């Protein structure tokens, strides 16, 4: 007798809307399958970090429900074990729903509930996805809670250490080059001298400030909606459910930043904590763009650019021009920055469009902010390791450029006056002479300006005040 191909490859599941055909080996069930069929949009699912957070949360909720005598210990143990497998990444392929789905994340919450129930069933424990796994919860508090757990962990465990590594690499270069003098530039035009170390100290401070911004948003980012259930009133959950769940999560993750939401209505109706955190990430993206672009410009050449520094040669740069090497990592940094800024725009739009008791842009906002955390973390580490650490300075070339800049006439203002100094600069530029020689040619050495005073004033390293670089503040 021939075997029906459909019966071999699919099984029938049911929910409150009726029967659904589900792939035979899938751990998900009816509600997940409906969402798979309803939202074949981008081919992009939840971030791995959010799936992990959903697993952590479901396990914590089961523990609390058991502690309160609401859930049988056998069922609680089965949920906790299955949820741990999900958190560890053993079942990522069982989360097929597109990120562009119902705006509350209900589909992904039920996906989690169904997978946990199916894992438990393999161990001989029967669980209902709603009655047991989702006990004392709704999608409206679990999905935002998982989002904030994942974002907080991404910030504390991953992004901040990566930014610290980048800061340290930049600060090391600032110290190494604190006496390497170069021409300053404002408006992309020659300005008075600075040191390469001073420039890099500025970059290091930008990253340090970025770390401070991320840390500053953690008190709001770490607020969790769990316990508010559908609309923030806590209906169908014990009064202290959220507090207990958060305590379990803090113990499991070590994230002391996690806390019960100050106001459960705000925690479900608005996503301001995500918007704020994304704003910090956007600012970091802006900082990285500035730093990467400066480094690209300083490394431009090798013969027709600035050629002030040399970037590590990482890979051939052209499929047609032999020997060409490009600044590939700074280019990757600026592309990441563009993506993060775009993600932030979508997050802001999503945050602005919550309505009454629930924001319904959470899956998109979650995906975007978690992607931004991931991109910034990875590119910051690579930028530090494979670019900044290997930079070298063309010291003599830098000094020649500094000494040839007409702007070094500036310290002569107090001796010969602004207008005469401007005339010196213009003549030096026109005649391709040094400022020193032009001052002498114009007969300006005399009572107001001795040759010794001229040389002292034209010391480009002294102009840069390199001794003011405070290593303790890097």
Curated annotation (Swiss-Prot):
Catalytic activity: (S)-malate = fumarate + H2O
EC number: 4.2.1.2
Modification N-acetylalanine, positions: 2
Further comment: There are 2 substrate-binding sites: the catalytic A site, and the non-catalytic B site that may play a role in the transfer of substrate or product between the active site and the solvent. Alternatively, the B site may bind allosteric effectors.
Ribosomal protein found in the keyword field: no
Protein name: Fumarate hydratase class II
CDD domains assigned to the protein according to its UniProt record, in alphabetical order: Fumarase_classII
One GO term describing the cellular component: peptidoglycan-based cell wall
Effect of residue 318 to A/C: Absence of fumarase activity
Cell compartments where the protein resides: Cytoplasm
Entries under PANTHER family matching the protein: ASPARTATEAMMONIA/ARGININOSUCCINATE/ADENYLOSUCCINATE LYASE, FUMARATE HYDRATASE CLASS II
Keyword Acetylation attributed: yes
One BP annotation, GO: tricarboxylic acid cycle
Pfam families assigned to the protein according to its UniProt record, in alphabetical order: FumaraseC_C, Lyase_1
Keywords: Acetylation, Cytoplasm, Lyase, Tricarboxylic acid cycle
Site (Important for catalytic activity) residue list: 331
First-listed, main subcellular location of the protein, grouped into a coarse class: cytoplasm
């Amino acid at each position: 007798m021939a075997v029906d191909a459909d019966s071999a490859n699919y099984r029938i599941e049911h929910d409150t809307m009726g029967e659904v055909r589900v792939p035979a080996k899938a751990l998900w069930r009816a509600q997940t399958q409906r969402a798979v069929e309803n939202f074949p949009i981008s081919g992009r699912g939840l971030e791995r970090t959010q799936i992990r957070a959903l697993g952590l949360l479901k396990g914590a909720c089961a523990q609390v429900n058991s502690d309160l005598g609401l859930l049988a210990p056998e069922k609680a143990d089965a949920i906790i074990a299955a949820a741990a497998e999900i958190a560890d990444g053993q079942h990522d392929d069982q989360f097929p729903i597109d990120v562009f789905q119902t705006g509350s994340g209900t589909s992904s919450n039920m996906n989690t509930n169904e997978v946990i129930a199916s894992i438990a069933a393999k161990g001989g424990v029967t669980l209902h996805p709603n009655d047991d796994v989702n006990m004392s919860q709704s999608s409206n508090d679990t999905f935002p809670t998982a989002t904030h757990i994942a974002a907080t962990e991404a910030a504390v465990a991953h992004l901040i250490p990566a930014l610290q590594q980048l800061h340290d690499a930049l600060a090391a270069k600032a110290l190494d080059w604190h006496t390497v003098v170069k021409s300053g530039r404002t408006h992309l035009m020659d300005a008075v001298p600075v040191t390469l170390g001073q420039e890099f100290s500025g970059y290091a401070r930008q990253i340090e400030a970025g770390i401070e911004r991320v840390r500053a948003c953690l008190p709001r980012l770490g607020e969790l909606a769990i316990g508010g259930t559908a609309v923030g009133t806590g209906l169908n959950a014990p009064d202290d459910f959220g507090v207990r769940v958060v305590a379990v999560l803090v113990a499991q993750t070590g994230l002391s930043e996690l806390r019960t939401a100050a106001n459960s209505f705000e925690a479900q109706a608005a996503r301001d904590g995500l918007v704020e955190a994304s704003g910090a990430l956007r600012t970091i993206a802006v900082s990285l763009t500035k730093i990467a672009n400066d480094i690209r410009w300083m490394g431009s050449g090798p013969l027709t650019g600035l050629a002030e520094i040399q970037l590590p040669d990482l890979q051939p740069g052209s499929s047609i021009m032999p020997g060409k090497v490009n600044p590939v990592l700074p280019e990757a940094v600026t592309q990441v920055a563009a993506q993060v800024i775009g993600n932030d725009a979508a997050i802001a739009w999503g945050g602005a469009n919550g309505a009454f008791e629930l924001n319904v842009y959470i899956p998109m906002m979650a995906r975007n902010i978690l992607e931004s955390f991931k991109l910034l973390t990875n590119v910051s580490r690579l930028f530090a390791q494979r670019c900044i650490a290997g930079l070298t300075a063309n010291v003599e070339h830098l000094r020649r450029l500094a000494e040839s800049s007409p702007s070094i006439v500036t310290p002569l203002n107090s001796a010969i006056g602004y207008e005469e100094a401007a005339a010196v600069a213009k003549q030096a530029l026109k005649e391709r002479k040094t400022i020193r020689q032009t001052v002498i040619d114009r007969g300006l050495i005399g009572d107001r300006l001795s040759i010794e005073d001229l040389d002292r004033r034209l010391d480009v390293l002294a102009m840069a005040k390199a001794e003011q670089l405070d290593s303790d503040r890097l």
